[in-house]
């Protein structure tokens, strides 16, 4: 069973995620990324989609042209879990050439 992060776990885990912010009114984190163009943004989304499918953990996201907004929360746990942190680190790695939007 997946458990939500405790407040101490959340504090420790989120310290390493510099571009992520808490979502107001939800136990979730979000990040916006800006790429050179739509093709680069879509390529990023494809890489994340493949990883998300492998993890069986899917992000909420929104894309317009070169911008991708990502929200992470684990629905089964009704909040942030280790899965969200792992996927956020993967997103940071594959999106490292993007600008914070």
Curated annotation (Swiss-Prot):
What is the E.C. number?
4.2.1.96
Output the Gene Ontology terms for molecular function: 4-alpha-hydroxytetrahydrobiopterin dehydratase activity
| Database matches in InterPro entries | PCD_sf, Pterin_deHydtase
Instruction: Write out the entry's keywords from A to Z.
Output: Lyase
Q: Which GO terms describe its biological process?
A: tetrahydrobiopterin biosynthetic process
Q: Please give the catalytic activity noted in the UniProt record.
A: (4aS,6R)-4a-hydroxy-L-erythro-5,6,7,8-tetrahydrobiopterin = (6R)-L-erythro-6,7-dihydrobiopterin + H2O
Q: Which domain of life is it from?
A: Bacteria
Write down the CDD domains for this protein, in alphabetical order. PCD_DCoH_subfamily_b
HAMAP family referenced in this protein's UniProt entry, alphabetically: Pterin_4_alpha (MF_00434)
Family to which the UniProt record says this protein belongs: Belongs to the pterin-4-alpha-carbinolamine dehydratase family.
> Could you identify this protein by its name?
Putative pterin-4-alpha-carbinolamine dehydratase
Q: Source species, please? A: Burkholderia mallei (strain ATCC 23344)
- From which lineage does this chain's organism come? Bacteria, Pseudomonadati, Pseudomonadota, Betaproteobacteria, Burkholderiales
């Amino acid at each position: 069973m997946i458990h939500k992060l405790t407040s101490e776990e959340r504090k420790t885990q989120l310290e390493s995620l510099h571009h992520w912010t808490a979502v107001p009114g939800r136990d979730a984190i979000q990040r916006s990324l800006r790429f050179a163009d739509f093709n680069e943004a879509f390529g990023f989304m494809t890489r994340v989609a493949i990883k998300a499918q492998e993890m069986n953990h899917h992000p909420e996201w929104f894309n317009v042209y070169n911008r991708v907004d990502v929200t992470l929360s684990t629905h089964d746990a009704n909040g942030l879990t280790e899965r969200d942190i792992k996927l956020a680190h993967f997103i940071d790695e594959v999106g490292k050439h993007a600008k914070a939007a």
